[in-house]
UniProtKB/Swiss-Prot annotation:
CDD domains linked: Chemokine_CXC (cd00273)
Protein name: C-X-C motif chemokine 13
Tissue expression: Highest levels in liver, followed by spleen, lymph node, appendix and stomach. Low levels in salivary gland, mammary gland and fetal spleen.
GO cellular component: extracellular region; extracellular space
Signal sequence segment: 1-22
GO biological process: antimicrobial humoral immune response mediated by antimicrobial peptide; B cell chemotaxis; cell surface receptor signaling pathway; cell-cell signaling; cellular response to lipopolysaccharide; chemokine-mediated signaling pathway; chronic inflammatory response; defense response to bacterium
Function description: Chemotactic for B-lymphocytes but not for T-lymphocytes, monocytes and neutrophils. Does not induce calcium release in B-lymphocytes. Binds to BLR1/CXCR5.
Source organism superkingdom: Eukaryota
Gene3D superfamilies associated with the record: 2.40.50.40
Gene this protein is translated from: CXCL13
């Protein structure tokens, strides 16, 4: 009797785990790669509206870089392209550097 109740409890526990995983997958809107084809052709900075970096995850085994151009076209860029690596390094340095905060000193009477 103890064995049957234990096995039933175990089966109930295992069957309840799959919906939890499904709830967590809601946060991943698409569980596949967004870029079908990647380009390594240089895009001048003046034509770029924004850049989105998608790290590798459950749905896609590779890192993806998506560039939105000002003419509303979207280009998937090869993350190994030298020009995009240099551009990302420049952007990282800009975002990590902080402007000095002005210090106002009060004169104590």
């Amino acid at each position: 009797m103890k064995f049957i109740s234990t096995s039933l409890l175990l089966m109930l526990l295992v069957s309840s785990l799959s919906p939890v995983q499904g709830v967590l997958e809601v946060y991943y809107t698409s569980l596949r790669c967004r870029c079908v084809q990647e380009s390594s052709v240089f895009i001048p900075r003046r034509f770029i509206d924004r850049i989105q970096i998608l790290p590798r995850g459950n749905g896609c085994p590779r890192k993806e870089i998506i560039v939105w151009k000002k003419n509303k076209s979207i280009v998937c860029v090869d993350p190994q392209a030298e020009w995009i690596q240099r551009m990302m390094e420049v952007l990282r340095k800009r975002s990590s550097s902080t402007l000095p905060v002005p210090v106002f000193k009060r004169k104590i009477p």
